[in-house]
Amino acid sequence: MEKLAAGLAGLRWSMGAFPLDLIVSRCRLPTLACLGPGEYAEGVSERDILLIHSCRQWTTVTAHTLEEGHYVIGPKIDIPLQYPGKFKLLEQARDVREPVRYFSSVEEVASVFPDRIFVMEAITFSVKVVSGEFSEDSEVYNFTLHAGDELTLMGQAEILCAKTTKERSRFTTLLRKLGRAGALAGVGGGGPASAGAAGGTGGGGARPVKGKMPCLICMNHRTNESLSLPFQCQGRFSTRSPLELQMQEGEHTVRAIIERVRLPVNVLVPSRPPRNPYDLHPVREGHCYKLVSIISKTVVLGLALRREGPAPLHFLLLTDTPRFALPQGLLAGDPRVERLVRDSASYCRERFDPDEYSTAVREAPAELAEDCASPRRARLCLPAPRAPGLARAPGPLAPAPAGEGDQEYVSPDWAAAPEPAAPPAEIPYEELWAHQGPEGLVRPPPGLDLISFGAAGPPRREPEAPPPPVPPKSEAVKEECRLLNAPPVPPRGGNGSGRLSSSPPVPPRFPKLQPVHSPSSSLSYYSSGLQDGAGSRSGSGSPSPDTYSLYCYPCTWGDCKVGESSSRPAPGPLPSTTQPSQASRALTEPLSGRAASLLGADTPVKTYHSCPPLFKPSHPQKRFAPFGALNPFSGPAYPSGPSAALSSGPRTTSGPVATSGPAYSPGPASPGQAYSAAPPSSCAPSSSSSSEWQEPVLEPFDPFELGQGSSPEPELLRSQEPRAVGTPGPGPRLSPLGPSKAFEPEGLVLHQVPTPLSPAALQGPEAGGALFLTQGRLEGPPASPRDGATGFGVRDASSWQPPADLSALSLEEVSRSLRFIGLSEDVVSFFARERIDGSIFVQLSEDILADDFHLTKLQVKKIMQFIKGWRPKI
């Protein structure tokens, strides 16, 4: 120590004094310094030689000691976030004023209307919102709430939504799964069958109506979006967060309490805490404290080198930070001075633990509450644009020019242009987020800050990133928000912009337009989303505890890991408000490796997503499909043919006679169109007519099938092998849509009857098309035994046999099938009213038949056995 003291006594000091933040940013730490002439620092004399150890970020919780039965408030202390002792939560005063309440629906929440609620379980809800009272356009509005989400209630509104008068769960789910939701509303066509679809036996299909649904307007602080929660939304809510309720039992560290409980909160020291030799306030067992707020500050650790040993101390980087002189040999790069610095550092390393010093409990100084109530003021101070001799980088520091020493050193965010009136001592929290648009923001010329020593230019307007897009809301919500005229809600997820600077971010200063008060004067770490990531701020603007680091800021000691000073990756390009000039940035490239961000990296910019539709078909569909929005047989697996071009035509068949809706003809139909069927030997003359229709006709399954020999092939196989009209093959054939040809099979006579057109629905792969045929009367000789099933004639319904594959049945054939298995006419008429064809029929379950259709057990058993292949032996 004697040798070290002799070396220190022989040091010669620079003539000028430098700001502490400039020394920290430009000098290799640790370094030696002493107070400049005329400067004062508490606990430091003019003769003391200081070892500037490191620059650190301290995050502490401000607490009041509670005495005399919680009524007398004692001194205010700072408890570091890394304090190892544990605390137990006491019964809070707010629990007496506002007892914990639980809700099971949004309607219950609206009836009480507390200031804020917390979601106790994940909730997903969906509602169909109509754009207007006289508009058919609608959009599905769905949202998801996560457990622990904090919602601030803002008001109530009503939205127009599409409701259904009555709806059955299982049958509705089946129709939606098949894409046949239109059948629910009775929009299958214009015929009389759909007119009575809403009033059938056993609860017919539901008809959509527009209704006003009351909603609760909330702000979700996790996503920073407003929500409209319908009253009918069910879920568990509470006035306390689930994490806070879990914290009522057990003992917890300060960090755990801050992350999960809304401040202020009263705590008790349940057991004897560990001792720290640097503690300036003893925390004893049984003491009670009120945790008030969280604050973050930048401090410079130092040691006064004295004969009795190093005395640790720290300086807050405020506007009145004292100036220090540096050894002249250090500025000139004298190796003897550098060796003296290394010896001093090794001497202090054995006698000083910076980590323990950083976690000590101290009494909060009174001036800190006044001068540094907001952590945005506790930051690295940037020098004003003076001292042109410092524009050299990274060479030795030059003293300030004479004659300018009387200028007060202030932070450059408001010191570049002198103002007649002093700025307010505190920036309101809402003001930080109001009026952030590019208009009206004229940035003063950049000063000589820690990194860039560039030339100052004229005032210029800095381009700023546009604000994030507004999340999608209904018109009613927008109108309600306009009526509420609520104060601006600051985003709690972070500042949203990346900064890479050696000093904490400084918000732009704006003239205060009107006093705007925060809805809560005590925003906590939990309620403000500090736990969401790096760079996030508490209600008072303090950084996340995750960005707190015990490692020094630009420290280059051997045991200090600079890379751990911030665990976040370097952000992208700088925002224009902190971007240094290109020339000055090039000068400071060697120093950029030592400068780490004190407040962590940026928070990712929030993007908004509108609600996607519930189901998007992979193939194009007509907007107003008559029988449901989707056709189960018209997917990409089925090749397109003539039926694909006809699939959008309206089709309604209910019963033996069907009437068409709009007069729609899918092709150049002539009055002579008819179904024609003949033995294979008689089909050759009609093959020449295929030139009238350029595309091959897919083989349909004749709804009036005449025999066992003409049962259809599977739909997929048949649709993949189209045959031209007139090709020999089993089953009936459809004549081309064109002018009438001379077609005279043996003994078959067609008598034209002037009756209106009626659609004959194509079945199987051609579902959805409609052919309009003239009503005629076919007469022919009785089918001979050798003709078998190929003879064409009108057979009575009693001889009709259902096919093996029921999925291709038409509405009429479903009715025939029900009569075939002996069901009553009221069941048959109910199935006809519900417009159940084969594709729906084969997917009916026992639950749907019994619960939704209210059929008897015998009827349910018959239908289920029939679907599975049972046929009555008649």
Swiss-Prot record:
Keywords: Phosphoprotein. Residues 188-206 have a biased composition (Gly residues). It comes from the Eukaryota. InterPro entries: CABIT_dom, GAREM, SAM/pointed_sf. GO terms for biological process: cognition; neuron projection extension; response to stress; social behavior. Residues 807-871 form the SAM domain. Residues 188-207, 388-422, 437-545, 563-598, 625-742 are annotated as: Disordered. Residues 12-339 are annotated as: CABIT. Residues 575-585 have a biased composition (Polar residues). The modification Phosphoserine is found at residue 735. The keyword Transferase does not apply. Residues 388-403, 518-545, 632-650, 658-691 have a biased composition (Low complexity). Belongs to the GAREM family. Probable adapter protein that may provide a link between cell surface epidermal growth factor receptor and the MAPK/ERK signaling pathway. This is GRB2-associated and regulator of MAPK protein 2. The gene is GAREM2.
